[in-house]
Amino acid sequence: MIYKVFYQASNDEVPVREKTDSIFVEAQSEREVRSKLKPYNYNIEFIQQVEGAFLEYEKQSENFKVLEL
């Protein structure tokens, strides 16, 4: 499954909506996504499973890249 993760790059700062980034991660569960990203010290805001029409739409973006962690 592919998950879209909304995050702040630094866990040490107060979250600011304008600094939110997103990445795509392949994993079997939300828990696995969190464990894969733990070493990066991201401030994870939201994790969303991406499938079906939503996945096809995201694939059209030039920024679509699934991280292999």
From Swiss-Prot:
| UniProt keywords, alphabetically | DNA-directed RNA polymerase, Nucleotidyltransferase, Transcription, Transferase
Give the GO biological process terms.
DNA-templated transcription
- Highest taxon listed in the record's lineage: Bacteria
Query: EC number(s) on record?
Result: 2.7.7.6
Keyword Transcription among UniProt keywords? yes
An example of a Gene Ontology cellular component annotation for this protein is: DNA-directed RNA polymerase complex
- Which reaction is this enzyme known to catalyze? RNA(n) + a ribonucleoside 5'-triphosphate = RNA(n+1) + diphosphate
A single GO molecular-function term is: DNA-directed RNA polymerase activity
Decide whether keyword Cell division is in the record: no
Q: What class of enzyme is it?
A: transferase
Similarity remark: Belongs to the RNA polymerase subunit epsilon family.
How does the record describe its quaternary structure? RNAP is composed of a core of 2 alpha, a beta and a beta' subunit. The core is associated with a delta subunit, and at least one of epsilon or omega. When a sigma factor is associated with the core the holoenzyme is formed, which can initiate transcription.
Q: What does this protein do?
A: A non-essential component of RNA polymerase (RNAP).
Official protein name in the record: DNA-directed RNA polymerase subunit epsilon
Please name the source species: Bacillus licheniformis (strain ATCC 14580 / DSM 13 / JCM 2505 / CCUG 7422 / NBRC 12200 / NCIMB 9375 / NCTC 10341 / NRRL NRS-1264 / Gibson 46)
